[in-house]
Amino acid sequence: YNLALRSIAVVRQQERAAKEIAQVDSLPSKDVRHIGYFDITLPGLDGQEISLSDVANGHVTLLSFTSMDTDWSTAYQSQIASLYETYSPRGLRVYQVSFDTDSYVWKNRVVNQPWHNVRDKDGVYSSLIGLYNISSVPALFLINGDGDIVTRATSFDEVRGLLGRLL
């Protein structure tokens, strides 16, 4: 019963998002700034809202969807850290969305990370899963400085190759 209610809630969120997109499509083009991604605004560690558009504006950005409460999280975060250390001096930004429902686990795992970490408390019922067509986590997207999604990466080697060309 709860699963059905949550599924209905997710579908309704997706319908609302689709209506918002339709409204944006009807705006005069001079009032619209082109971006090739769905904007995300979620709370960070301090509770303040952080928007993907604020982080990515004019910068190459790695958009990461993940969960900290998994057996693979440590290795994954190590790979993100390696990319950040190598490419942030050249302008790379990282915006990481966690689908953890347990805020304690999430906060303890990201507290020392220097990039932008936000948490979607809806977990696997997040509307972002549908908007970004995420079938499993982790999921990586690379956004160029113009705001276009360059790739949905399947490996960190792919990301490194693209970052070498974009930065």
Language-model features and meaning:
Residues 124-166:
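Thiol/disulfide oxidoreductase modules built on the thioredoxin-like
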Residues 57-58, 89, 134-137:
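Active-site acidic short loop of glycosyltransferases
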